[in-house]
Amino acid sequence: MSNKNKKIVQGEEDEEEDDLYDDYDDKPKTTTTTTTSTSMNKSDSNISLNKEMLINDHPEDLIVGANSPLNVSVTTTPIENINENPSPVNLDEQTQQTQPQQNPISPITPLSSSSPSSSTTTTTITNSAVSPSNILITPTQSPIEIKPIIETQQPLPSPPQQGPSPIILQHQQQQQPLQSQYITPPIPQPQYQPIASQQSQQPQQIPTRKLSGSQMLPQRIPLSLGENKLKEFNENLRKSYCTKTHMLYYSINKEVSGANQHLTGVIDLIKSVQHNIRQYNDDILTLEEKLEQTEWSLQYYFNNNSNNNS
Protein backbone atom coordinates (compact mmCIF):
# COMPACT_ATOMS: atom_id res chain seq x y z
CA MET A 1 0.00 0.00 0.00
CA SER A 2 1.59 3.27 -1.10
CA ASN A 3 0.51 6.91 -0.82
CA LYS A 4 1.09 9.46 -3.60
CA ASN A 5 1.06 13.25 -3.56
CA LYS A 6 0.41 13.46 0.18
CA LYS A 7 0.64 16.93 1.79
CA ILE A 8 0.08 17.77 5.44
CA VAL A 9 -0.53 21.38 6.38
CA GLN A 10 0.64 22.44 9.81
CA GLY A 11 -0.05 25.64 11.70
CA GLU A 12 2.16 28.63 11.03
CA GLU A 13 3.24 31.33 13.38
CA ASP A 14 1.04 34.14 14.66
CA GLU A 15 2.22 36.75 12.14
CA GLU A 16 1.50 34.56 9.10
CA GLU A 17 -1.94 33.50 10.38
CA ASP A 18 -3.19 37.11 10.45
CA ASP A 19 -2.25 37.53 6.79
CA LEU A 20 -3.90 34.25 5.87
CA TYR A 21 -7.23 35.20 7.44
CA ASP A 22 -7.21 38.58 5.66
CA ASP A 23 -6.53 36.97 2.29
CA TYR A 24 -9.06 34.20 2.82
CA ASP A 25 -11.97 36.61 3.20
CA ASP A 26 -11.50 37.83 -0.39
CA LYS A 27 -11.04 34.35 -1.95
CA PRO A 28 -13.85 32.22 -3.43
CA LYS A 29 -14.91 28.82 -2.15
CA THR A 30 -12.32 26.07 -2.03
CA THR A 31 -12.61 22.53 -3.31
CA THR A 32 -10.68 19.53 -2.06
CA THR A 33 -10.76 16.36 -4.11
CA THR A 34 -9.54 13.00 -2.94
CA THR A 35 -9.22 10.22 -5.44
CA THR A 36 -8.63 6.66 -4.33
CA SER A 37 -7.98 3.89 -6.79
CA THR A 38 -7.87 0.24 -5.77
CA SER A 39 -6.81 -2.64 -7.96
CA MET A 40 -7.60 -6.24 -6.96
CA ASN A 41 -6.47 -9.42 -8.58
CA LYS A 42 -7.55 -12.82 -7.26
CA SER A 43 -4.53 -14.62 -8.65
CA ASP A 44 -2.10 -12.39 -6.71
CA SER A 45 -2.41 -11.60 -3.01
CA ASN A 46 -0.89 -8.09 -3.46
CA ILE A 47 -3.26 -5.15 -2.99
CA SER A 48 -2.05 -1.70 -4.03
CA LEU A 49 -3.77 1.43 -2.83
CA ASN A 50 -3.00 4.73 -4.55
CA LYS A 51 -4.29 7.94 -3.13
CA GLU A 52 -4.03 11.24 -4.85
CA MET A 53 -4.83 14.43 -3.10
CA LEU A 54 -5.10 17.65 -5.08
CA ILE A 55 -4.74 20.78 -2.99
CA ASN A 56 -4.68 24.40 -4.15
CA ASP A 57 -1.50 26.40 -3.98
CA HIS A 58 -2.65 28.36 -0.98
CA PRO A 59 -2.35 26.40 2.33
CA GLU A 60 -5.00 28.54 3.98
CA ASP A 61 -7.65 27.00 1.72
CA LEU A 62 -7.61 23.86 3.85
CA ILE A 63 -9.19 25.76 6.77
CA VAL A 64 -12.83 24.72 6.99
CA GLY A 65 -15.45 26.35 9.19
CA ALA A 66 -16.79 24.16 12.00
CA ASN A 67 -20.32 25.52 11.65
CA SER A 68 -20.43 25.41 7.83
CA PRO A 69 -22.38 22.58 6.11
CA LEU A 70 -20.47 20.10 3.94
CA ASN A 71 -21.57 18.67 0.59
CA VAL A 72 -20.14 15.21 -0.06
CA SER A 73 -20.36 13.60 -3.50
CA VAL A 74 -19.34 9.96 -3.95
CA THR A 75 -19.10 8.34 -7.37
CA THR A 76 -18.54 4.60 -7.72
CA THR A 77 -17.56 2.90 -10.98
CA PRO A 78 -18.48 -0.79 -11.29
CA ILE A 79 -16.01 -3.66 -11.74
CA GLU A 80 -15.54 -5.01 -15.25
CA ASN A 81 -17.48 -8.22 -14.75
CA ILE A 82 -20.08 -6.76 -12.37
CA ASN A 83 -22.82 -4.54 -13.73
CA GLU A 84 -24.33 -2.52 -10.93
CA ASN A 85 -26.82 0.28 -11.10
CA PRO A 86 -27.55 1.34 -7.50
CA SER A 87 -30.49 3.62 -6.89
CA PRO A 88 -29.44 7.22 -5.97
CA VAL A 89 -30.43 8.30 -2.50
CA ASN A 90 -31.12 11.96 -1.55
CA LEU A 91 -30.80 12.89 2.14
CA ASP A 92 -32.39 16.17 3.15
CA GLU A 93 -30.38 18.24 5.64
CA GLN A 94 -33.37 19.46 7.66
CA THR A 95 -35.66 16.42 7.68
CA GLN A 96 -32.83 13.81 7.41
CA GLN A 97 -35.05 11.44 5.45
CA THR A 98 -33.90 9.23 2.60
CA GLN A 99 -35.79 9.44 -0.72
CA PRO A 100 -34.83 6.49 -2.93
CA GLN A 101 -35.50 6.94 -6.63
CA GLN A 102 -37.22 4.28 -8.64
CA ASN A 103 -34.35 2.73 -10.60
CA PRO A 104 -34.14 -1.00 -11.22
CA ILE A 105 -31.32 -2.91 -9.53
CA SER A 106 -29.45 -5.22 -11.81
CA PRO A 107 -28.42 -8.67 -10.53
CA ILE A 108 -24.81 -9.50 -9.70
CA THR A 109 -22.92 -11.92 -11.89
CA PRO A 110 -20.31 -14.21 -10.28
CA LEU A 111 -16.63 -13.32 -10.61
CA SER A 112 -14.25 -15.64 -12.43
CA SER A 113 -10.93 -16.54 -10.79
CA SER A 114 -8.79 -15.46 -13.79
CA SER A 115 -10.28 -12.07 -14.73
CA PRO A 116 -8.91 -9.00 -12.82
CA SER A 117 -11.19 -6.34 -11.39
CA SER A 118 -10.80 -2.65 -10.58
CA SER A 119 -12.78 -0.09 -8.61
CA THR A 120 -12.44 3.69 -8.33
CA THR A 121 -13.98 5.96 -5.68
CA THR A 122 -13.94 9.77 -5.87
CA THR A 123 -14.86 11.97 -2.90
CA THR A 124 -15.41 15.74 -3.20
CA ILE A 125 -15.72 18.06 -0.18
CA THR A 126 -16.95 21.62 -0.78
CA ASN A 127 -16.87 24.43 1.78
CA SER A 128 -19.65 27.01 1.59
CA ALA A 129 -18.88 29.26 4.59
CA VAL A 130 -15.99 30.46 6.73
CA SER A 131 -15.61 30.56 10.51
CA PRO A 132 -12.68 31.52 12.78
CA SER A 133 -12.09 27.93 13.95
CA ASN A 134 -9.22 26.11 12.25
CA ILE A 135 -9.79 22.52 11.14
CA LEU A 136 -7.03 20.62 9.35
CA ILE A 137 -7.99 17.77 7.01
CA THR A 138 -5.50 14.93 6.65
CA PRO A 139 -5.99 11.79 4.56
CA THR A 140 -6.41 8.61 6.56
CA GLN A 141 -5.78 5.05 5.51
CA SER A 142 -8.55 2.53 6.12
CA PRO A 143 -8.20 -1.20 5.46
CA ILE A 144 -10.26 -2.65 2.64
CA GLU A 145 -12.24 -5.78 3.41
CA ILE A 146 -12.38 -8.35 0.62
CA LYS A 147 -15.29 -10.77 0.90
CA PRO A 148 -15.35 -13.92 -1.26
CA ILE A 149 -18.20 -14.29 -3.70
CA ILE A 150 -19.82 -17.73 -3.77
CA GLU A 151 -20.51 -18.96 -7.28
CA THR A 152 -23.98 -20.31 -7.89
CA GLN A 153 -24.71 -23.40 -9.94
CA GLN A 154 -26.72 -21.49 -12.56
CA PRO A 155 -25.37 -17.95 -13.27
CA LEU A 156 -27.96 -15.23 -13.62
CA PRO A 157 -28.37 -13.60 -17.05
CA SER A 158 -26.43 -10.35 -17.40
CA PRO A 159 -28.61 -7.35 -18.39
CA PRO A 160 -27.33 -4.68 -20.80
CA GLN A 161 -24.65 -2.40 -19.40
CA GLN A 162 -25.81 0.97 -18.11
CA GLY A 163 -23.90 4.00 -16.94
CA PRO A 164 -23.32 4.42 -13.19
CA SER A 165 -25.62 6.77 -11.31
CA PRO A 166 -24.06 9.12 -8.67
CA ILE A 167 -25.04 9.00 -5.00
CA ILE A 168 -25.36 12.43 -3.30
CA LEU A 169 -25.15 12.45 0.50
CA GLN A 170 -25.08 15.28 3.05
CA HIS A 171 -23.30 15.07 6.45
CA GLN A 172 -22.89 11.27 6.34
CA GLN A 173 -22.67 8.41 3.88
CA GLN A 174 -25.01 5.45 4.23
CA GLN A 175 -24.48 2.07 2.64
CA GLN A 176 -27.58 0.21 1.57
CA PRO A 177 -27.48 -3.52 0.79
CA LEU A 178 -28.25 -4.55 -2.75
CA GLN A 179 -31.38 -6.58 -3.31
CA SER A 180 -31.67 -9.05 -6.13
CA GLN A 181 -34.54 -8.77 -8.59
CA TYR A 182 -34.92 -12.52 -8.74
CA ILE A 183 -36.83 -13.72 -5.68
CA THR A 184 -37.69 -17.37 -5.41
CA PRO A 185 -41.41 -17.83 -4.70
CA PRO A 186 -42.30 -19.84 -1.58
CA ILE A 187 -43.07 -23.50 -2.14
CA PRO A 188 -46.77 -24.16 -1.48
CA GLN A 189 -47.25 -26.73 1.24
CA PRO A 190 -50.17 -29.17 1.03
CA GLN A 191 -52.80 -28.67 3.65
CA TYR A 192 -53.60 -31.82 5.58
CA GLN A 193 -56.76 -32.08 7.64
CA PRO A 194 -57.23 -34.79 10.26
CA ILE A 195 -59.75 -37.52 9.65
CA ALA A 196 -61.83 -36.44 12.65
CA SER A 197 -62.31 -32.93 11.21
CA GLN A 198 -63.31 -34.36 7.82
CA GLN A 199 -65.84 -36.60 9.48
CA SER A 200 -67.20 -33.70 11.53
CA GLN A 201 -67.70 -31.61 8.38
CA GLN A 202 -69.86 -34.32 6.77
CA PRO A 203 -73.54 -34.14 7.80
CA GLN A 204 -74.60 -36.93 10.11
CA GLN A 205 -77.34 -39.12 8.67
CA ILE A 206 -79.68 -40.77 11.18
CA PRO A 207 -81.01 -44.15 9.99
CA THR A 208 -84.78 -44.16 9.71
CA ARG A 209 -87.22 -47.01 9.17
CA LYS A 210 -90.05 -46.62 6.76
CA LEU A 211 -93.46 -47.66 8.09
CA SER A 212 -96.42 -48.68 6.04
CA GLY A 213 -99.88 -47.21 6.46
CA SER A 214 -101.02 -50.01 8.80
CA GLN A 215 -97.92 -49.71 10.98
CA MET A 216 -98.13 -45.96 11.55
CA LEU A 217 -97.75 -44.99 15.21
CA PRO A 218 -100.86 -43.43 16.79
CA GLN A 219 -100.59 -39.74 17.41
CA ARG A 220 -100.88 -38.65 21.05
CA ILE A 221 -103.87 -36.47 21.76
CA PRO A 222 -102.96 -33.75 24.26
CA LEU A 223 -105.28 -33.69 27.28
CA SER A 224 -104.47 -30.29 28.61
CA LEU A 225 -107.51 -30.03 30.89
CA GLY A 226 -107.11 -33.49 32.42
CA GLU A 227 -103.37 -33.03 32.88
CA ASN A 228 -103.90 -29.75 34.70
CA LYS A 229 -106.50 -31.30 37.01
CA LEU A 230 -104.23 -34.25 37.70
CA LYS A 231 -101.39 -31.92 38.56
CA GLU A 232 -103.64 -29.95 40.92
CA PHE A 233 -104.90 -33.17 42.56
CA ASN A 234 -101.36 -34.42 43.06
CA GLU A 235 -100.32 -31.13 44.59
CA ASN A 236 -103.31 -31.09 46.97
CA LEU A 237 -102.69 -34.71 47.96
CA ARG A 238 -99.07 -33.99 48.68
CA LYS A 239 -99.95 -30.98 50.82
CA SER A 240 -102.63 -32.86 52.76
CA TYR A 241 -100.35 -35.83 53.33
CA CYS A 242 -97.59 -33.56 54.59
CA THR A 243 -99.93 -31.76 56.99
CA LYS A 244 -101.38 -35.04 58.30
CA THR A 245 -97.97 -36.54 58.88
CA HIS A 246 -96.87 -33.42 60.73
CA MET A 247 -99.99 -33.46 62.91
CA LEU A 248 -99.50 -37.16 63.68
CA TYR A 249 -95.90 -36.57 64.60
CA TYR A 250 -96.82 -33.69 66.88
CA SER A 251 -99.60 -35.75 68.56
CA ILE A 252 -97.32 -38.75 69.07
CA ASN A 253 -94.64 -36.53 70.52
CA LYS A 254 -97.20 -34.95 72.86
CA GLU A 255 -98.47 -38.34 74.02
CA VAL A 256 -94.97 -39.60 74.61
CA SER A 257 -94.09 -36.52 76.62
CA GLY A 258 -97.29 -36.99 78.73
CA ALA A 259 -96.48 -40.68 79.29
CA ASN A 260 -93.00 -39.71 80.40
CA GLN A 261 -94.44 -37.28 82.91
CA HIS A 262 -96.90 -39.94 84.19
CA LEU A 263 -94.10 -42.48 84.54
CA THR A 264 -92.02 -40.02 86.49
CA GLY A 265 -94.98 -39.55 88.88
CA VAL A 266 -95.39 -43.31 89.27
CA ILE A 267 -91.68 -43.68 89.96
CA ASP A 268 -91.89 -41.02 92.62
CA LEU A 269 -94.85 -42.82 94.20
CA ILE A 270 -93.00 -46.13 94.20
CA LYS A 271 -90.04 -44.50 95.84
CA SER A 272 -92.28 -43.07 98.56
CA VAL A 273 -93.87 -46.51 99.17
CA GLN A 274 -90.46 -48.09 99.49
CA HIS A 275 -89.49 -45.45 102.01
CA ASN A 276 -92.64 -46.13 104.03
CA ILE A 277 -91.98 -49.89 103.98
CA ARG A 278 -88.51 -49.32 105.31
CA GLN A 279 -89.93 -47.23 108.12
CA TYR A 280 -92.47 -49.96 108.92
CA ASN A 281 -89.68 -52.54 109.06
CA ASP A 282 -87.76 -50.38 111.47
CA ASP A 283 -90.83 -50.00 113.68
CA ILE A 284 -91.36 -53.76 113.68
CA LEU A 285 -87.77 -54.35 114.76
CA THR A 286 -88.15 -51.92 117.64
CA LEU A 287 -91.36 -53.63 118.76
CA GLU A 288 -89.67 -57.02 118.72
CA GLU A 289 -86.92 -55.72 120.95
CA LYS A 290 -89.47 -54.28 123.38
CA LEU A 291 -91.32 -57.60 123.51
CA GLU A 292 -88.14 -59.45 124.36
CA GLN A 293 -87.42 -57.00 127.14
CA THR A 294 -90.89 -57.44 128.56
CA GLU A 295 -90.47 -61.20 128.46
CA TRP A 296 -87.17 -61.00 130.31
CA SER A 297 -88.68 -58.70 132.88
CA LEU A 298 -91.68 -60.95 133.45
CA GLN A 299 -89.51 -64.04 133.88
CA TYR A 300 -87.34 -62.23 136.37
CA TYR A 301 -90.37 -61.10 138.31
CA PHE A 302 -91.87 -64.60 138.44
CA ASN A 303 -88.60 -66.10 139.58
CA ASN A 304 -88.29 -63.65 142.45
CA ASN A 305 -91.84 -64.32 143.64
CA SER A 306 -91.32 -68.05 143.64
CA ASN A 307 -88.19 -67.73 145.69
CA ASN A 308 -89.94 -65.55 148.24
CA ASN A 309 -92.81 -67.97 148.66
CA SER A 310 -90.52 -70.89 149.25
UniProtKB/Swiss-Prot annotation:
The keyword Coiled coil applies. Residues 94-126, 164-184, 192-208 have a biased composition (Low complexity). Residues 11-25 have a biased composition (Acidic residues). It holds the Pfam family BLOC1S3. GO terms for cellular component: BLOC-1 complex. Transmembrane segments: none annotated. Keywords: Coiled coil. Residues 268-299 form a coiled coil. Signal peptide: none annotated. This is Uncharacterized protein DDB_G0292106. It comes from Dictyostelium discoideum (Social amoeba).
